[in-house]
Structures are given as C-alpha cells and as structure tokens.
C-alpha cells in the first residue's frame, strides 16, 4: 500500500464556494474541491495555496485549518491510502480559470446548497460543510471582513 498526502482548500468569496469540474478521458467526471500533492520541503499550508492557485488561478488567503479526510483507491500499480489536509480560504474576487492540463474543464463559485449537491465525493461534502459553518461563525462575528493587508500572505 502506498501512503500519499495532499492538501486543498475550501475557498469562499461573498458566501460562495469554489468548485472545479474534472473530466479525465470520460473515466472520471465530477465536481471537486481544489487539492494536490505535497512537494518535497513544502509545508501543508503552502501546498494548499499553491494547488488552489495552479488549478484555478485564484490567489487565496488561508483563514484556518479545517481538518483532514482519508480515502483509498486503486492506483496504477498498488492501492493508495490518501490523506488530504483541508484549509478554509478566502478569495478576493470571483475570477477563476480551470487548469486544462489537469483535465479541469470548468470552475466557478456556487452557493452552499448548490455546491453541496454538485460535489462528487461525500468526504469533500463533509469538509465543505465544516468549512462553511466556520465561515458563517466568522461572518456572524464580523471577522470575515477583508483586511487592508489582503495581498500579503496570499499565494502568488
């Protein structure tokens, strides 16, 4: 069994959640959250920011760690046990552009109930739900307001 680690983000802008649509040779089709593999020497937080930017062109800011999900799948040569670390992130615009090289054909920001039903995987639904509730708590406390120093501490 191969152990693999990825990191990703639940990116929110004005209450809407960023999703990607992946279509890989008609074998894998569905809406997902942005995530990707940790590179050597990279911190999880950095990986999450980099992957969000690479897959969507969104320069996001990490707000907090949300948790992790785990799943297994059949890889090319062996079973892969993957752990994904997730972060709640904030974007400062709705602009996004899917990374075609990774077979993402669409990207967009969706209301919570739309995103919940669009997501292909239940573990991503649960992480998104947890992140959205954290966002709502911050919004209620007026702590989600974009600071003037937004451009600091974002990827890119």
Show which residues each predicted segment covers.
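Charged phosphate-binding loop/patch that engages nucleotide di/tri-phosphates or the phosphate backbone
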Residues: 117, 122-156
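A periodicity- and composition-biased signal for non-globular, repetitive helical segments
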Residues: 28, 41, 88, 130-131, ...
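N-terminal strand-loop-strand
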Residues: 1-33
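A generic structural signal for ordered secondary structure
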Residues: 8, 16-18, 45, 65, ...
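Unchanged
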Residues: 38-126, 155
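Functional cleft and adjacent loop/helix regions within the main domain
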Residues: 34, 40, 148-151
């Amino acid at each position: 069994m191969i152990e693999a680690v990825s990191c990703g983000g639940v990116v929110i802008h004005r209450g809407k959640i960023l999703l990607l649509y992946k279509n890989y040779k008609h074998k894998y089709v569905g809406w997902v959250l942005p995530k990707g593999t940790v590179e050597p020497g990279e911190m999880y937080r950095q990986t999450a920011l980099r992957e969000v930017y690479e897959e969507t062109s969104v320069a996001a800011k990490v707000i907090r760690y949300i948790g992790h999900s785990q799943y297994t799948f059949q890889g090319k040569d062996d079973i892969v046990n993957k752990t994904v670390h997730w972060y709640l992130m904030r974007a400062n615009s709705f602009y996004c552009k899917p990374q075609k090289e990774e077979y993402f054909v669409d990207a967009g920001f969706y209301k919570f109930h739309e995103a919940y039903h669009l997501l292909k995987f239940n573990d991503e639904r649960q992480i998104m739900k947890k992140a959205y509730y954290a966002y709502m708590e911050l919004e209620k406390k007026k702590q989600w307001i974009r600071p003037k120093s937004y451009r600091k501490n974002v990827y890119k």
